[in-house]
């Protein structure tokens, strides 16, 4: 049996731009892509913390060190600059691999620079303010 599991996520990133007239996708700073083990063209789900919008798209590589999280195409109707979002990538794996797999969890600061890397999808860094862990 195959299971679809959380592969990686970038938690509470700030959207820096939105371009309705682009062909689609989300532009992500190359440093964040590396931290979250994302590659260009990989499918991601974007969850907008501000309004609850949830959408599926693919990643394109943004300028390294820029902090860019750019929403492109029709998704710009749902997600806007300044919104906090979670980018989630899933992977399909055999049951045994899924049970041992540790996802990459990336927390970022207000400028979308990685500040904490982990493997626990429910982990909350000590300096995360009002965020609560479900554990």
Curated annotation (Swiss-Prot):
InterPro entries: Asp_de-COase-like_dom_sf, Asp_decarbox. Transmembrane segments: none annotated. Pathway: Cofactor biosynthesis; (R)-pantothenate biosynthesis; beta-alanine from L-aspartate: step 1/1. It is found in: Cytoplasm. The modification Pyruvic acid (Ser) is found at residue 25. The active site is at residues 25, 58. One of its GO terms (molecular function) is aspartate 1-decarboxylase activity. Binds 1 pyruvoyl group covalently per subunit. It holds the Pfam family Asp_decarbox. Gene3D superfamilies: 2.40.40.20. Keywords: Autocatalytic cleavage, Cytoplasm, Decarboxylase, Lyase, Pantothenate biosynthesis, Pyruvate, Schiff base, Zymogen. Its cofactor is pyruvate. One of its GO terms (cellular component) is cytosol. Is synthesized initially as an inactive proenzyme, which is activated by self-cleavage at a specific serine bond to produce a beta-subunit with a hydroxyl group at its C-terminus and an alpha-subunit with a pyruvoyl group at its N-terminus. Belongs to the PanD family. PANTHER family: ASPARTATE 1-DECARBOXYLASE (PTHR21012:SF0). Heterooctamer of four alpha and four beta subunits. HAMAP family: PanD. This is Aspartate 1-decarboxylase. It comes from Mycolicibacterium vanbaalenii (strain DSM 7251 / JCM 13017 / BCRC 16820 / KCTC 9966 / NRRL B-24157 / PYR-1) (Mycobacterium vanbaalenii).
């Amino acid at each position: 049996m195959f299971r679809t599991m959380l592969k990686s996520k970038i938690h509470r990133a700030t959207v820096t731009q939105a371009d309705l007239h682009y062909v689609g996708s989300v532009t992500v700073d190359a440093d964040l892509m590396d931290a979250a083990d994302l590659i260009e063209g990989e499918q991601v789900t974007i969850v907008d913390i501000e309004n609850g919008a949830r959408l599926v798209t693919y990643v394109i590589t943004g300028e390294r060190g820029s902090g860019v999280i750019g929403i492109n195409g029709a998704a710009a109707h749902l997600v806007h600059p300044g919104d906090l979002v979670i980018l989630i990538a899933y992977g399909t794996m055999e049951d045994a691999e899924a049970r041992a797999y540790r996802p990459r969890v990336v927390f970022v600061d207000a400028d979308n620079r990685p500040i904490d890397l982990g493997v626990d999808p429910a982990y909350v860094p000590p300096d995360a303010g009002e965020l609560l862990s479900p554990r």
